[in-house]
């Protein structure tokens, strides 16, 4: 223990609501947390999380990895938008797939992501009208697990009564629960809380920090942020070009997944259908296999057989990646460029089983195309792509074996990851621009 420093835990309730308030997708469908400027304190984001009691209707069954939030919005005390992540539910599934199978197994009881355990045996547990306590890890670069530094909320102005305002928008019922009969199923959140760990320093330490700020110093807080781009695949052709316009000074990673353009709630869900790709709103398409509602693996015909990224006159990689005879090269390329090619293989690289056979999850439902523009692992240095330099779009050229819209209309969901810095300045002001 460092002299003059102590840790304590507190919980922040949604603004203007009591602890037993019920949030649903149609009424009270936004959670707002106003993070106070705690005196002499820093937030330890690694030890902080959102918790709530997740309830279903009597005929509702949670999808194997329920994502109750579709959008995350984080503002400073002066209203500046620091993070705005639309389709954060899809981003959450994407990063869950990049965890190891062992991690997902260990977290299943808290997160209700049961995909790494026996899904069929847990089917009955995913309907609970009395509720299940669920932990949600924020997909936030500032207040989530991605933040590697303590967040100095005590040094931020709170003239409005808070240092940050966090807004979470609830997802539609169809993407959180399926129906075990032919009637619509619903879900709700109760007992919602943002459990936070604070690191509190002494008055003497805080006085030294305030003195440095008063003399013109500033506190840099690096953080990641993500931007969502969704583009529909149009026409009946097998070649599609996706242009993404994003002005980022330090663009590090890109992730693209292929998904249905729309989703309707699945009905008459059983423990067998529960496993099917077509019953999971967060299945990613582009691979060569699918687990059907009957429990059998089927061959897909509309798989991706070639792709390449392009920015300006430069291709990434230098020549298109041809996926022959399967999608293994896309998997290994994504793992290598994201520095995931080690002994702790992610969940999307494991096998999915049915009663008689196994196939790679990457082929059956977790297909993703990823690329990292980071030139080195050094932190604090601009090593990504400056896409604001020329204004040219980033293009993803896709070649399919057959028309990807033949079975159902699809879209390409792309997330742009960039690195920013929040500068905390004298008098508690903050900005993403230094000095």
Over which residues does each language-model region extend?
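Short, low-complexity Pro/Thr/Gly
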Residues: 1-435
